[in-house]
Amino acid sequence: MEQYESSLAAAYIRGAAKRLSLSLPEDLLTKPLENLTDAELAVLLETGRDAELKLYHFKKKELLPRVKAVLGILKGIQPESLLDVGSERGVFLFPFLLEFPWVEVTSVDLLPHRVEMLQCISAGGIDRLTAIEQNICTWDREDGAFDTVTLLEVLEHIPNVQEAVNTAVRLARRYVVVSVPSQPDDNPEHIHLLTKNILTGLFQNAGCRKLHFSGVNGHLILLANVSE
């Protein structure tokens, strides 16, 4: 499984095997991921391919500059727990899981098939990951439920962006991390161009005053300290 992130791919295949009743030896389904041999990982990969599971999400690839930047921020603040909003294909979430193996992570997404993929990863051995089908704008989870909230390439898609920001600030105990495109593009799903001034207003309206902005390759990144 050299071209794959083996722990993530193996977890997904094992979780999907349970859902789909694929034939696998019991020990391959229950053995801790870190104890699987190369031969056992190869069996899992072959099973996943035979079942036509979508394994391309788990191929090793170079991190996007914006993802590297956010991971660097998170290494600086060392989150105790994380809520990732709109995880989609795991462009950020998967590297985070690999680089922060001690952090409890909750992912919320509107798309059922995205949530199901992440639930398979959790069921397959990465049980510190919880995936929920949920709308961040209307989620009534208790205040301060998560140390840090990430909204990465998400806010530009949300019609009521102020409501999403309000909820993120309410749910975070310490930080909210945001990335958005900094230039107009032709993506019809991008319904806002969120400039530094606009984001500042949104977070100030939510009661957050301590904001730090940075940028990388066409993206604006915000670290909002909600505890001060």
Q: Where does each model-flagged region fall?
A:
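Conserved N-terminal segment of class I S-adenosyl-L-methionine
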Residues: 1-144, 148, 152, 162-165, ...
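Short glycine-rich, flexible loops that bind phosphorylated cofactors or substrates
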Residues: 157-158, 184-185
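Conserved beta-strand signature within the Rossmann-like core of class I S-adenosyl-L-methionine
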Residues: 173-182
